[in-house]
Amino acid sequence: MDFEASAKILTTPVKGAKIVSNMTVDELVREYAGCAFGAGRLAKAVDIYYEMLASEKTTKFFGLAGAMTPAGMRNIIADLIRDGYIDVLVTTGANMVHDTVEALGLHHYKGSDCTNDIQLRHECIDRIYDVYLPDQHFTDLEEFLQGVYAGLPQEKLSIRQVLTEIGKNLDDDSSILKTAAEMGVPVYCPALQDSVIGLQAWLYKEGNPLHVDAFADMHEFMEICFETESAGAMLLGGGVPKNYILQSMLVTPRSFDYAIQLTMDHPETGGLSGATLDEAQSWGKVGENAKSVTVYADSTITLPLIVSAVRTRLSKR
């Protein structure tokens, strides 16, 4: 055994977490820092996210995939926008659909994944894992959207502009779209057609003038990327939001300096949602010296913990 070589490798002993009563989330996370596996990765994510949010020169991108809003994560994201911790939001259409549903006072309901889905269909109840919502909610949403589309300017619009107008028509301080519209934070949804918002836009366009340029957002988005001095990304899940954010740096002279990915997908199948941030370095999307980590766990568990711990640290600056 080469003891000198081993000493260079065996530098950081695992330190067991000590749990005491009345701990804050940040104190718990600091105990995680001495642990391995997911606990250690979560602690690293908090360290990186704190540094990213504390940096005034860093443009903060947030990728929102999956079904985070029906699961109850919208308040966290709206508050991050309101407090200046998200500069650019890229999302799936579904997240904004369910954000709008809630903003209209139409609730999602806790249900069960062990149920009779045929019975739910007969009762006109839709299921998202263990979340239920009535079909009637979509009828009400569609009526609202048709009214918004009827009031849009008769000029060519980007998808971002359409989402901003939807946000301006909402009256709910917990709404992501409303908060983003008020704070001037752009919300990009490259696959808006893949949602009820997009479907209703198409239905409206069948009988009325509606001019939406699906590529118009690219110019605005790339300008943000070119002008930023430093860039950081918090990625919930993968899919279109993750790729749209990371690919943007391919046409700029820089890469992301910070990157955090919260996912349950794995890299073996070659899909983007499971692709590691190390893999993104091979493309030049994430910088050679970037601070990055992937946390393999349910984002509805990890996001609140990370944000809570980081907010505690930010409040003590």
From Swiss-Prot:
**InterPro entries from the UniProt entry:** Deoxyhypus_synthase_arc (IPR022899), Deoxyhypusine_synthase (IPR002773), Deoxyhypusine_synthase_sf (IPR036982), DHS-like_NAD/FAD-binding_dom (IPR029035)
Q: What UniProt keywords are attached to this protein's entry?
A: Hypusine biosynthesis, NAD, Transferase
Q: Which domain of life is it from?
A: Archaea
The EC number of this protein is 2.5.1.46
Q: Which reaction does it catalyse?
A: [eIF5A protein]-L-lysine + spermidine = [eIF5A protein]-deoxyhypusine + propane-1,3-diamine
Which pathway does the database say it acts in? Protein modification; eIF5A hypusination
Cofactor dependency: NAD(+)
- Residue ranges spanning the membrane: these are none
UniProt-annotated catalytic positions: K285
Q: Name any GO cellular component annotation.
A: cytoplasm
What the record says about family reads: Belongs to the deoxyhypusine synthase family.
Name of the protein described by the UniProt record: Probable deoxyhypusine synthase
Could you read off the lineage of the organism from its UniProt record? Archaea, Methanobacteriati, Methanobacteriota, Stenosarchaea group, Methanomicrobia
